[in-house]
Every structure is written in C-alpha cells, then in structure tokens.
Amino acid sequence: MHEMSIVEGIRTAIEEAARANGFAKVTRVRLEIGRLAGVERAALDFAFDVVLRGSLAEGAAVQIIDLPGQAACFDCGKTVEIEHRLDICPECGGTRLLVQGGDEMRIKDLEVL
C-alpha cells in the first residue's frame, strides 16, 4: 500500500510548511491527483486517518481534485483524454499514446489556523 508513504510525505510537507509559516493547525488539505497516478482513493482515505493521527493535521478535511488523464496520439496527432495508461486513442483507435498529464499528485493548498 504505497498510499501510506504518500501520506507520510504529505505529513512531512505540512510539518515543514508549519515551521516555515508559523501555523498550528490544518483544517483542510486540498490535493490534486491525476487519474493515472495509480492512487487508490479508499486506501488514501485510510492512510490519512492513520498517518495524520496526532499531527497538526489530525481531523483535517481532505478534498481531492480529480485531474483527467491526457495523452498525445502519435497516429492522429491529437491530444486526447484517457482513463488508463493502456487506453487506445478515442479519436482514431491508435495505440501509440504518450501520457502528457493526469499522472501528477500535489498538495494544492492548506487551510490553516
């Protein structure tokens, strides 16, 4: 379950931001997660409950902004939306796609006290 290590990284980033900016409590964490990032949402929710326990973000609301998968098709030259890495081009049926977005994951912002 790599979601635990993802949330551990988020906890570290929150702690570093708290030290740098002087806040004591996080009430909301907004994340941008691409559909191609390979993150299981139920496992991520569980990891947040476990990893953030006892931290300044314990009990914070977690909002996930879903980013679509995007790929460039070498066959028709279009940029298309995809759901999975091995999808075919919805425009031409081509199989030579290069992922260009939707595999990212980042903290968009924090609501703090």
UniProtKB/Swiss-Prot annotation:
Keywords: Metal-binding, Nickel, Zinc. HAMAP family: HypA_HybF. GO terms for biological process: protein maturation; protein modification process. This is Hydrogenase maturation factor HypA. PROSITE patterns: HYPA. Zn(2+) binds at residues 73, 76, 89, 92. Involved in the maturation of [NiFe] hydrogenases. Required for nickel insertion into the metal center of the hydrogenase. It holds the Pfam family HypA. Ni(2+) binds at residue 2. PANTHER family: HYDROGENASE MATURATION FACTOR HYPA. InterPro entries: Hydgase_Ni_incorp_HypA/HybF_CS, HypA/HybF. The keyword Cell wall biogenesis/degradation does not apply. NCBIfam families: hypA. Belongs to the HypA/HybF family. One of its GO terms (molecular function) is nickel cation binding. The keyword Zinc applies. It comes from Rhodobacter capsulatus (Rhodopseudomonas capsulata).
